[in-house]
């Protein structure tokens, strides 16, 4: 752990604040006409996801946390647990489905993920930014709606609904952004 000044906090930094671990989502340096400058920081709690806005003056110091990043391979799902394997030591890690959240639906056998660890305890997980999935259902194209960019709903193999362009049909493979849960492009 390293101490840093409040004005050195940048987006992506993980800090210890009020007894919890927080990641800086957004920062903004404010220089008011009267008084000293400060750093307005939007923080997100790594454990429960709550958000908090804090002001840090340059004279304040905070603990910057160094997270260990480990690569894991997704193995299988068992009840409410997701099982991953460390690619270095072959040890298995079991995480609750709630820990991964809605993005658990994107996990596929053998998919590589990065788990963020603090003192050997998992506190976050990063999935690949894009995955390739097959469309199981797509509404038919309605003729005459081509004047404006129109999208139609489609259901993916994992049950997630996304909006796709009219030329995409059932059975096609598309690339989906796992962060925004949006259509990116047709897969090759």
UniProtKB/Swiss-Prot annotation:
InterPro entries assigned to the protein according to its UniProt record, in alphabetical order: Elong-fact-P_C, NA-bd_OB-fold, Rib_uL2_dom2, Transl_elong_fac_P/YeiP, Transl_elong_KOW-like, Transl_elong_P/YeiP_cen, Transl_elong_P/YeiP_CS, Transl_elongation_fac_P
Molecular-function GO term, any one: translation elongation factor activity
Domain of life: Bacteria
UniProt record, GO biological process: peptide biosynthetic process
A Gene Ontology cellular-component term: cytoplasm
Principal location class: cytoplasm
Listed pathway(s): Protein biosynthesis; polypeptide chain elongation
Protein location: Cytoplasm
Claim: Protein biosynthesis is one of the keywords in the record: yes
Pfam families per record: EFP, EFP_N, Elong-fact-P_C
Keywords for the protein's UniProt record, in alphabetical order: Cytoplasm, Elongation factor, Protein biosynthesis
NCBIfam families referenced in this protein's UniProt entry, alphabetically: efp (TIGR00038), PRK00529.1 (NF001810)
HAMAP family for this protein: EF_P
Physiological role: Involved in peptide bond synthesis. Stimulates efficient translation and peptide-bond synthesis on native or reconstituted 70S ribosomes in vitro. Probably functions indirectly by altering the affinity of the ribosome for aminoacyl-tRNA, thus increasing their reactivity as acceptors for peptidyl transferase.
Similarity comment text for this entry: Belongs to the elongation factor P family.
Protein name: Elongation factor P 1
Source lineage: Bacteria, Pseudomonadati, Pseudomonadota, Alphaproteobacteria, Hyphomicrobiales
């Amino acid at each position: 752990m390293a101490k840093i000044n409040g004005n050195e906090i940048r987006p992506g930094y993980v800090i210890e604040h009020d007894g919890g671990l927080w990641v800086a989502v957004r920062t903004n340096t404010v220089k008011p006409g009267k008084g000293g400058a400060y750093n307005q920081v939007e923080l997100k709690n790594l454990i429960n996801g709550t958000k908090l806005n804090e002001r840090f003056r340059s004279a304040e110091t905070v603990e910057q946390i160094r997270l260990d990043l480990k690569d894991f391979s997704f193995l299988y799902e068992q009840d409410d647990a997701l099982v991953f394997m460390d690619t270095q030591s072959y040890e298995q890690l079991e995480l609750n489905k709630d820990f991964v959240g809605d993005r658990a639906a994107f996990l596929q056998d053998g998919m590589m993920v990065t788990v963020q660890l603090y003192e050997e305890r998992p506190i976050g997980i990063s999935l690949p930014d894009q995955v390739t999935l097959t469309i199981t259902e797509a509404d038919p194209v309605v003729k005459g709606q081509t004047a404006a960019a129109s999208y139609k709903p489609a259901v993916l193999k994992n049950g997630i609904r996304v909006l796709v362009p009219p030329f995409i049909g059932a059975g096609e493979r598309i690339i989906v952004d796992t962060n925004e849960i949006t259509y990116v492009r047709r897969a090759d």
